[in-house]
Amino acid sequence: MKKISLLFLICGLFLVSSCIPTQTIKGDGNITTENIPVSEYDCLELEGGGMVVNYTQSEAPEGLEIKTDRNIFEKYEFNVENHKLKIRPKKEFRKHTNFRPTEFMVTANSRNLKKLAAAGSTHVNINSPLQAEEF
């Protein structure tokens, strides 16, 4: 009897947890391109959906260009903390939000890249040979 009760409890918890509402934000089709000034970074941390990243290692100053729907752009943050370039949804959109952009193109470059971390449906293109002490 205890096993059956435990089974019903587990099934009930599973059903309740699967009912957590998620929000889907679709791109509005108003594609915009923004150049964002960034300081020196050697790590890329990417989070979100539908993102295509084109990275180039070069001696040029660090750069970041974002091309996406205006309504998607407004819900993301782009900043460098402790030499890590972080591209991710703003805090209020990190949980239970699906992004479906019309287009989400990130073009980034830096002098050095030690680490790359991506979460979500992100495609990364490395457009140059990488020279790194560790990777």
Predicted features along the sequence, with ranges:
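Intrinsically disordered, low-complexity terminal regions
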Residues: 2-135
